[in-house]
Amino acid sequence: MAKENFDRSKPHVNVGTIGHVDHGKTTLTAAITKVLADKGLAEKRDFSQIDNAPEEKERGITINTSHVEYATATRHYAHVDCPGHADYVKNMVTGAAQMDGAILVVAATDGPMPQTREHILLARQVGVPAMVVFMNKVDLVDDPELLELVEMEIRELLSFYNFPGDTMSIIKGSALGGLNADPKWVATIEELMNAVDNDIPIPPRLTDQPFLMPVEDVFSITGRGTVATGRIERGVINSGEGVDIIGFGAENLKSTVTGVEMFRKILDRGEAGDNVGLLLRGIEKESIKRGMVICKPGSVKPHSEFKGEIYVLSKEEGGRHTPFFNKYRPQFYMRTTDVTGEIELPAGTEMVMPGDNITITVKLIAAIALEKGLRFAIREGGRTVGAGQVTEILK
């Protein structure tokens, strides 16, 4: 088994294949695992294994996603591939599979198609930081001028959506040829992975980012003070460090962490991913509640107005049966709590149908800790009717 070779000391990067239906995303995913498996860096996964993507639930939305993992000489990758277009839209908009970079697959036989455009736009909206292009099926195109034309079209489309179209790596190859071990095409898969290694930056580790913990619960411990519990979202907290407490009218609430509790033991520090209780000096239990966040001083501000990119569940997915209109007021579930907000639709849009994805403006009734990229679910009477993420802070 190749699994034993996985070297966890390599930096980890999340990638995914995007692009138009039938342009070869899944075949390329299979080809990458095959070429790397032949070097002992992955487990080979065949097309049908990847294509039969298991259903996953993310914030109440069912998404079909395939996850494969592989390594190159320098990195370890988790790679997502989705069978259907709707799955991509849901995946990218809800951030179910966070991508540090994307491999855009475009068939040389077709050139960019409607979903190519839509996936590039989505990648722009949800902030996929980097991309590499694989021009697939070039073995089926005899005319080199046609290949140049398709490359030009791809570059123009990328530039139109504010990606570096002029400089982005475009590798011309054949996923099927690579999968069938034809040396000429295997080389193009290797070239692609070199580009992915070089062009997609390693994301900053969660522990290197400024400390933030959403509050889940608050207790009062006699003689010790107030303890707020939650899962540390990012960063590191050490006993003795100062923090800000933000959201729901917590104005300039500051404190010092006098202890970090984990599994009933008092520790000196907690880091991203830990479920902890933070002992807070000089804070009344009444002044802090679920949904607030505790963070590194000055790192996050409370906001009440933002733009978001959302996916609205279809009726079949358990969403609304009817469209919603301007000034619709659902709850936005952010981190650990619901906040009511009013939705403003883009000019010229009268209503939003179940199954749509759209950019909206939201005014929340309370200011909470918000930042670009924060994900949320949209709920109505406790059931999820949509999901999305913050794309811009307005106020």
Swiss-Prot record:
UniProt gene name: tuf
Any one Gene Ontology molecular-function term assigned to this protein's record: GTPase activity
Compartment(s): Cytoplasm
Function: GTP hydrolase that promotes the GTP-dependent binding of aminoacyl-tRNA to the A-site of ribosomes during protein biosynthesis.
Stretches the record annotates as G1: 19-26
Region entry G5, spans: 174-176
Binding site for Mg(2+): T26
One CC-aspect GO term: cytosol
Family as reported in the entry's similarity comment: Belongs to the TRAFAC class translation factor GTPase superfamily. Classic translation factor GTPase family. EF-Tu/EF-1A subfamily.
Main location per the UniProt record: cytoplasm
Region (G3): 81-84
NCBIfam families: EF-Tu, PRK00049.1, PRK12735.1, PRK12736.1, small_GTP
Region (G2) location: 60-64
Gene3D superfamilies in the record: P-loop containing nucleotide triphosphate hydrolases, Translation factors
EC annotation from Swiss-Prot or TrEMBL: 3.6.5.3
Protein name: Elongation factor Tu
Pfam families, A to Z: GTP_EFTU (PF00009), GTP_EFTU_D2 (PF03144), GTP_EFTU_D3 (PF03143)
Subunit note: Monomer.
InterPro entries referenced in this protein's UniProt entry, alphabetically: EF-Tu_GTP-bd, EF-Tu_GTPase, EFTu-like_2, EFTU_2, G_TR_CS, P-loop_NTPase, Small_GTP-bd, T_Tr_GTP-bd_dom
Chemical reaction(s) catalysed: GTP + H2O = GDP + phosphate + H(+)
Binding site for GTP: 19-26, 81-85, 136-139
Native source species: Cytophaga hutchinsonii (strain ATCC 33406 / DSM 1761 / CIP 103989 / NBRC 15051 / NCIMB 9469 / D465)
Domain tr-type G residue range list: 10-205
Disulfide bond sites: none
Coiled coil, from the record: none
G4: annotated segments: 136-139
UniProt xrefs under PROSITE patterns: G_TR_1, G_TR_2
